[in-house]
């Protein structure tokens, strides 16, 4: 990798002159600029973004903090962020918060130290983590899992929850286990409330359960006690786990219990039976959030909350009447 000294030697100028030309913080004659540019191209020199940011008090770095990079949904989100950022001349510094406040705070501190111009984040584990995000005083856009009052790019979760409920009703659901995640987040609350409303209006029995506390033994108890014939999951990864448990319990999907997921991650077509699920535009969520953030950084427009449509993908894990 070429160094700034090699660029200076190639262009026959001082290192200080190369630095001024790159950072734009001093006068450099056009003829000299042309020589430096030719040297940069010839040597394929890549300026250090962090070093430049320290000189310019501004960077082309964006911090990206996601809650679970093992979930393919967030992998797609990250790809959308990265592709849009690179197309606009920015770089990404990524952190996997893993719903761990200590990790989240460490990544936020790293974004600050490295002079990130803005931050894109999804679910944070605690109110204190959100406070520290806002304390950076950098423009930020949240993806999918917002708290009240934050600028967010998310899918239409009211529509998503409605589609989940309508789909299992089409399969003649009579007793439903409705799984949910942290309802303090608007996205989880919206899809939960929407599904529950549709089911209750259809006079269907509904049992609710915090997803993270569900075990195979508890699932078996619910099925025996409430004659559960349909399960709504808040994401595809949980839906796969539920279907594995049902297989272990010798319960047929969808004949005895139908299962519907949320996200439509790539593995949804690889499982047997293939998973009926709500498709979230994960890649587009990442792109939209990045575009909004960069537009704000460049003074084009202030970010506004955006809602993207979802759709239902019917596969083999639900019944069709």
Locations of the language-model features?
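N-terminal helix-turn-helix DNA-binding module of bacterial transcription factors
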Residues: 1-60, 76, 319
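Amphipathic helical "hinge" segments at domain boundaries
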Residues: 45-110, 114-115, 196
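Append "Primarily bacterial transcriptional regulators
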Residues: 7-8, 40, 184, 257, ...
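Flexible loop/hinge segments that line or gate small-molecule binding clefts
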Residues: 99, 121-163, 237, 263-275
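Flexible loop/turn connectors
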Residues: 221-321
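Short, solvent-exposed amphipathic alpha-helices that sit
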Residues: 35, 73-87, 160-163, 186-204, ...
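An alpha-beta-alpha
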Residues: 164-204, 302-318
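Hydrophobic alpha-helical segments within soluble ligand-binding/sensing domains
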Residues: 153-178, 214-221, 239, 280-298
